[in-house]
């Protein structure tokens, strides 16, 4: 993942106390970038709470549908937490401490700030957690597709 790679570069710069390295400033944009999945749960929730999910005769299909949609819940929670972290970083650190006009070209030493270092570690962690949740969802979707294919072959 490109974002993890860039954050890892920042982290290495901080570990080496290479605060004047221009990469520290140029790569810091990756702290506020977020790519969301936005899973759509409405259809599944309507099926589940109305009892209509039981209309699917095949138990394997019902389970595959449920399992797939249930993998989306952790994604939604992780992405929400990640967004709150980004917003707090923006409001509590970037706005009061960084000149946006110079960001990316300046060698300001905000890399020495513990808030900045903590944010790098936090983002590395949240991105890794998101990746894990996405991978689980992808595997579940593959199983659902396989179940659909098996049903088509038997009908």
Per-region residue spans from a language model:
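Long, hydrophobic alpha-helical segments that serve as membrane-spanning/inserting helices
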Residues: 1-155
């Amino acid at each position: 993942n490109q974002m993890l790679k860039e954050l890892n570069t920042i982290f290495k710069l901080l570990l080496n106390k290479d605060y004047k390295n221009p990469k520290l400033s140029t790569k810091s944009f990756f702290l506020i970038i977020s790519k969301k999945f936005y899973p759509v749960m409405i259809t599944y929730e309507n099926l589940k709470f109305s009892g209509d999910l039981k209309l699917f005769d095949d138990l394997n299909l019902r389970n595959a549908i449920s399992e797939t949609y249930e993998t989306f819940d952790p994604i939604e929670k992780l992405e929400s937490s990640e967004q709150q972290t980004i917003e707090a970083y923006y409001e509590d650190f970037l706005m009061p401490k960084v000149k946006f006009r110079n960001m990316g070209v300046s060698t300001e030493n905000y890399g020495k700030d513990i808030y900045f270092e903590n944010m790098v570690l936090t983002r590395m962690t949240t991105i890794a957690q998101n990746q894990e949740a996405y991978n689980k969802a992808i595997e579940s979707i593959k199983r659902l597709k396989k179940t659909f294919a098996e049903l088509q072959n038997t009908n």
